[in-house]
């Protein structure tokens, strides 16, 4: 009987098993980027001219009603005024006072901001190109989950696969398992046979990853595996599996492949790490139901 290949066994031919998302060429993006973001720069200029301080400018941005415009204005503010402020904090209206208290003293002076802004053309191609990079952030991950769901549903027509296929709220394990110790633990998909939970899954596309980010991802995976399997075993569900779907060229960087192989080998038969191309061969009905 042929022995099933483990994730680590694919390493010698790893390039053949990853899926590459298509990108966009520079400088071809510039006309579209300038068309999209020139209104943002015009609005930033208007708010800047009406501001007597950088703190007032930030407060004015936070009062912008349109969420998309507010987010883009925050990104421009970060570049010109406060590069040290986390953009996620800048985007939340409820954090406005906290941002001013924690980072306001380091905001660049509004007069200097005006001078720097006026020194750039309108539209500023360089800044528009930077903003364009944010536009599709997360899109590759959404594409991955959408294709994954299509694969799983075509391969396992009698099973139910739930979770956000593109943008949407993650599945929280507190809504999947009763009395789960970390109810706010987010996962990307759950596979059911009727009402029986067969597998919990996470899916990620790694365009470029290494160093601390690499350590963070694999550390999180070890923690999630231990947590889910520990809960399942203590609640009479030794059949529950954990699936990590990872794809993209980031898998080829550093020790990523070996680290994922190690995670799979720690829980043989219970945890599998796969790329999209491995799903048909490795995520079988026999394994899911075993």
Which sequence ranges carry the predicted segments?
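Short acidic/polar alpha-helix capping motifs at helix-coil junctions
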Residues: 110-116, 150-156, 227
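Acidic-basic catalytic patches of nuclease active cores, encompassing PD-(D/E)XK
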Residues: 24-28, 32, 124-175
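Catalytic core segments in nucleotide and nucleic-acid processing enzymes
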Residues: 159-290
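Glycine-rich, often proline-containing surface loops adjacent to acidic residues and nearby aromatics
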Residues: 122-132, 197-205
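Nuclease-adjacent, charged terminal/linker segments that flank catalytic cores
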Residues: 1-121
């Amino acid at each position: 009987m042929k022995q099933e290949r483990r994730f680590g066994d694919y390493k010698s031919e790893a390039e053949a098993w990853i899926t590459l998302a298509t990108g966009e060429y520079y400088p071809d993006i510039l006309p579209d980027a300038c068309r999209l973001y020139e209104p943002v720069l015009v609005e930033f200029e208007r708010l800047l001219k009406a501001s007597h301080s950088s703190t007032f400018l930030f407060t004015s941005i936070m009062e912008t009603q349109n969420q998309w415009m507010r987010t883009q204005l925050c990104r421009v503010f970060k570049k010109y005024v406060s590069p040290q402020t986390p953009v996620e904090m800048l985007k939340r209206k409820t954090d406005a006072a906290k941002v001013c208290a924690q980072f306001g003293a380091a905001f660049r002076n509004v007069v200097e901001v005006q001078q720097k802004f006026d020194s750039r053309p309108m539209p500023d191609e360089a800044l528009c190109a930077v903003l364009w990079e944010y536009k599709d952030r997360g899109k590759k991950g959404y594409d991955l989950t959408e294709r994954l769901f299509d694969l799983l549903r075509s391969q396992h027509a009698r099973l139910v696969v739930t979770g956000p296929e593109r943008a949407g709220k993650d599945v929280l394990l507190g809504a999947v398992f009763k009395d789960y110790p970390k109810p706010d633990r987010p996962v990307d998909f759950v596979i059911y046979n009727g009402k029986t939970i067969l597998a919990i899954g996470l899916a990620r596309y790694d365009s470029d990853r290494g160093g601390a980010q690499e350590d963070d991802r694999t550390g999180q995976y070890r923690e999630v595996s231990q947590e889910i399997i520990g809960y399942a075993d203590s609640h009479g569900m030794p059949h529950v599996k954990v699936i990590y779907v990872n794809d993209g060229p980031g898998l080829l960087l550093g020790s990523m492949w070996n680290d994922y192989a190690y995670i799979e080998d720690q829980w043989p038969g219970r945890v599998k790490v796969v790329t999209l191309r491995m799903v048909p061969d490795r995520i079988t009905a026999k394994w899911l139901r075993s």
